């Protein structure tokens, strides 16, 4: 144990830079002879020096006959190799022509596909632009359809409703018109029908304990309806009245309505049923 050091120091490892990737040199094109040899299957490996036999035991004539035989065999082998090579070349040429035809057909197909895709892309862009224009036009049309053009009527006053003894009045805008609107006539007929139905129900039930607010509401609606018809007639006859005169007429109308309302409230509190029936008969007699 005494051989071991008493202290052990742990030091940080040195910073080792990452090895830079080596740039690969571009591959050189193979020479034509090597390409042809690969296609034909020739052996391009290195060949050693040819060893010659010692012919010391043969005579000169035997050497000549042997040489002639070897030349004849070599010529025949060369002819056979030439035929075999020519056959291989024909096969390779046939395969290359077929591959060239296939590549040309594939290239033409890819050209047509690329052209179709470009046309579809242009058509999609044009279609999107047309859709955006149509959408904008439809939005504009919807906006203009939602716009409502209203004509203001001179002296048109909202009905006065009494709830719990407090007045809640709403005043509508006033303007000049030349002739009465159809919806005003329909509204007047509907109001008369509603009032007659309410009175029939009241007569059938014979209920004398009806709230004062209901009487005052009905009276206010009737007064407003009659005054509106009068104002419509006067506005048709004199369409050139100024706005100041119209405002003064509205103020006077409001004052008369308030006075009439107070009077009606007193009368209704005294005897509700009889006074309301007289008032309704009076309005029915008026054309």
From Swiss-Prot:
Residues 63-87 are annotated as: Disordered. GO terms for cellular component: nucleus. InterPro entries: bZIP, bZIP_sf, ER_Stress-Reg_TF. It is found in: Nucleus. The keyword GTP-binding does not apply. One of its GO terms (molecular function) is RNA polymerase II transcription regulatory region sequence-specific DNA binding. Residues 63-88 are annotated as: Basic motif. It comes from the Eukaryota. The keyword Transcription regulation applies. Residues 78-87 have a biased composition (Basic and acidic residues). CDD domains: bZIP_XBP1. SMART domains: BRLZ. Keywords: DNA-binding, Nucleus, Transcription, Transcription regulation, Ubl conjugation. SUPFAM superfamilies: Leucine zipper domain. Its main location: nucleus. It holds the Pfam family bZIP_2. Disruption phenotype: RNAi-mediated knockdown inhibits induction of expression of the endoplasmic reticulum chaperone BiP homolog hsp-4 and heat shock protein hsp-3 during the unfolded protein response (UPR). Larval development is normal, but in a pek-1 genetic background, causes arrested development at or prior to the L2 larval stage. Abolishes crt-1 promoter activity. Reduces lifespan, perhaps acting independently of macroautophagy. In combination with RNAi-mediated knockdown of atf-6, causes lethality early in larval development. GO terms for biological process: defense response to Gram-negative bacterium; determination of adult lifespan; endoplasmic reticulum unfolded protein response; ERAD pathway; IRE1-mediated unfolded protein response; lipid homeostasis; negative regulation of multicellular organismal process; positive regulation of transcription by RNA polymerase II. Residues 61-117 form the bZIP domain. Residues 89-117 are annotated as: Leucine-zipper. PANTHER family: X-BOX BINDING PROTEIN 1 (PTHR46542:SF1). Required for transcriptional regulation of the unfolded protein response (UPR) in the endoplasmic reticulum (ER) under stressed conditions, acting downstream of ire-1, and also maintaining ER homeostasis via a negative feedback loop, in parallel with ER kinase pek-1. May also regulate Golgi protein trafficking distal to the ER. Protects the host organism from the detrimental effects of mounting an innate immune response to microbes, such as the Gram-negative bacterium P.aeruginosa, probably by modulating the UPR. This is X-box-binding protein 1. It comes from Caenorhabditis elegans. The lineage of its organism: Eukaryota, Metazoa, Ecdysozoa, Nematoda, Chromadorea.
């Amino acid at each position: 144990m005494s051989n071991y050091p008493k202290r052990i120091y742990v030091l940080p490892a040195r910073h080792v830079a990452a090895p830079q990737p080596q740039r690969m040199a571009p591959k050189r094109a193979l020479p034509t002879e090597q390409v042809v040899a690969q296609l034909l299957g020739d052996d391009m490996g290195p060949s050693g020096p040819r060893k010659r036999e010692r012919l010391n035991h043969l005579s000169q004539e035997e050497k000549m006959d042997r040489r002639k035989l070897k030349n004849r065999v070599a010529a025949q082998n060369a002819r056979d190799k030439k035929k075999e090579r020519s056959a291989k070349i024909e096969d390779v040429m046939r395969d290359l022509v077929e591959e060239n035809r296939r590549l040309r057909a594939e290239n033409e197909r890819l050209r047509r596909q690329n052209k179709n895709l470009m046309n579809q892309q242009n058509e999609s862009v044009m279609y999107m632009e047309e859709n955006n224009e149509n959408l904008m036009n439809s939005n504009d049309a919807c906006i203009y359809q939602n716009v409502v053009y209203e004509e203001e009527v001179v002296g048109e006053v909202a009905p006065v409703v009494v709830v719990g003894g407090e007045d809640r009045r709403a005043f509508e805008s006033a303007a000049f018109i030349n002739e009465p609107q159809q919806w005003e006539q329909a509204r007047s007929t509907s109001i008369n029908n509603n009032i007659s139905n309410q009175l029939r129900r009241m007569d059938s039930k014979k209920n004398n304990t009806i709230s004062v607010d209901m009487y005052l509401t009905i009276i206010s609606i009737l007064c407003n309806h009659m005054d509106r018809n009068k104002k419509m007639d006067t506005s048709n006859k004199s369409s050139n009245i100024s706005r100041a005169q119209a405002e003064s007429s509205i103020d006077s109308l409001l004052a008369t309505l308030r006075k009439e309302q107070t009077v009606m409230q007193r009368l209704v509190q005294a005897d509700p049923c009889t006074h309301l029936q007289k008032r309704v008969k009076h309005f029915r007699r008026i054309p």
